[in-house]
From Swiss-Prot:
<feature type="binding site">
    <location>
        <position position="361"/>
    </location>
    <ligand>
        <name>UDP-alpha-D-glucose</name>
    </ligand>
</feature>
<dbReference type="Pfam" id="PF00201">
    <property type="entry name" value="UDPGT"/>
</dbReference>
<dbReference type="GO" id="GO:0006486">
    <property type="term" value="P:protein glycosylation"/>
</dbReference>
<feature type="binding site">
    <location>
        <position position="341"/>
    </location>
    <ligand>
        <name>UDP-alpha-D-glucose</name>
    </ligand>
</feature>
<keyword id="KW-0328">Glycosyltransferase</keyword>
<comment type="similarity">
    <text>Belongs to the UDP-glycosyltransferase family.</text>
</comment>
<feature type="binding site">
    <location>
        <position position="21"/>
    </location>
    <ligand>
        <name>an anthocyanidin</name>
    </ligand>
</feature>
<feature type="binding site">
    <location>
        <position position="381"/>
    </location>
    <ligand>
        <name>UDP-alpha-D-glucose</name>
    </ligand>
</feature>
<dbReference type="InterPro" id="IPR002213">
    <property type="entry name" value="UDP_glucos_trans"/>
</dbReference>
<dbReference type="GO" id="GO:0050502">
    <property type="term" value="F:cis-zeatin O-beta-D-glucosyltransferase activity"/>
</dbReference>
<feature type="active site" description="Charge relay">
    <location>
        <position position="127"/>
    </location>
</feature>
<feature type="binding site">
    <location>
        <position position="91"/>
    </location>
    <ligand>
        <name>an anthocyanidin</name>
    </ligand>
</feature>
<feature type="binding site">
    <location>
        <position position="356"/>
    </location>
    <ligand>
        <name>UDP-alpha-D-glucose</name>
    </ligand>
</feature>
<comment type="function">
    <text>Utilizes UDP-glucose as the sugar donor and catalyzes the formation of O-beta-D-glucosyl-cis-zeatin from cis-zeatin. May regulate active versus storage forms of cytokinins and could have an impact on seed growth.</text>
</comment>
<feature type="binding site">
    <location>
        <position position="339"/>
    </location>
    <ligand>
        <name>UDP-alpha-D-glucose</name>
    </ligand>
</feature>
<feature type="binding site">
    <location>
        <position position="360"/>
    </location>
    <ligand>
        <name>UDP-alpha-D-glucose</name>
    </ligand>
</feature>
<dbReference type="GO" id="GO:0035251">
    <property type="term" value="F:UDP-glucosyltransferase activity"/>
</dbReference>
Amino acid sequence: MAVDTMESVAVVAVPFPAQGHLNQLLHLSLLLASRGLSVHYAAPPPHVRQARARVHGWDPRALGSIHFHDLDVPAYDSPAPDLAAPSPFPNHLMPMFEAFAAAARAPLAALLQRLSTSYRRVAVVFDRLNPFAATEAARLANADAFGLQCVAISYTVGWLDPGHRLLSDYGLQFLPPDDCMSREFVDLVFRMEEEEQGAPVAGLVMNTCRALEGEFLDAVAAQPPFQGQRFFAVGPLNPLLLDADARTAPRHECLEWLDRQPPESVLYVSFGTTSCLHADQVAELAAALKGSKQRFVWVLRDADRADIYAESGDSRHAKFLSEFTRETEGTGLVVTGWAPQLEILAHGATAAFMSHCGWNSIIESLSHGKPVLAWPMHSDQPWDSELLCNYFKAGLLVRPWEKHAEIIPAQAIQKVIEEAMLSDSGMAVRQRAKELGEAVRASVADGGNSRKDLDDFIGYITR
């Protein structure tokens, strides 16, 4: 591809302002910039800062290849998560979501207008929760819009047709959105979709690959809303690290600790950035980890606030942790701040991942050949756990979704930990995850389906 052709095209990435969405579009932005494209990343100021601070797996200098733009929105409340809320959905983020949905359009429109006068073509890659970006792209004669699918493409099959043949053939259960998300969030999503209905979209970019979801990709392509659109399954978007990559400085303390552990001996425990465990559940999980006598790295932190820079940094678990860390010294490590998940999953000492089953975490874990102990919390996570355990066969279920309001006792958690780490059935799941990891990594290698789709996407936007 001629350099002048690449430089005459601007890619504008418009993420939804939540961690699991911010990082997927930043990974894609870095991939495209590494291929010589001019890439612009646009989000509210705290979320630009957050995305830059938390991205990992890349050479830090790579961020210099991205043009970052602030989308100014009015001030919004940034409360702490409500630990007494009846639903695990992070409804404390709704003021920020509402402010973004109402106000991000105008600064984005101004940015697109400005770029359209400087570049031959503008490709707007927007999180599908931001349909207004497609509307603004359609106002420009030299712009195309592409939705980014930040969740499993199979989730879209269930959303459009819960009775689809693929679900029934594999015995998969899809839960209605109202069961797993707050009514306020579902209403916001539908309202935004209705307001932007009819905005032309040139195609769909997906953080998945045919090795994982090939059947579901074909099923979605056949659905009326997507017929005629171009599909680019370019995942995994996250870098694929070798164990050696996890040993480059500067290093997090947990990686130094992992260096001292035997191969495939450590359970990594983390529940993402939008989930909290009640104190009683923390105590039960702690008892399970201690009772299992397995090595572990446990990231114990509450859900992000809307503005992570407004957080106090104090842990509500300080008193509990002082005793627990003493009792498990040498066996486990508790991290109360941000942890480098990709490096942990790539590390040779890590055997498995107990997770909330966000799609980022699922695909990061599988791409490094690590099975998942599934503990879904909200949103698409119950579906991801269903896909993981009953379709990929690379996970074990810790907590069924129907028990999400219950405290899971230590004995039940410990049983799953021991199955994953010690039993023949757990070994089969771990072997299956390794096989999937090899297939996923082959997808992004030369000649792989995801590499081809990324090449096709770049070829299309630079045509």
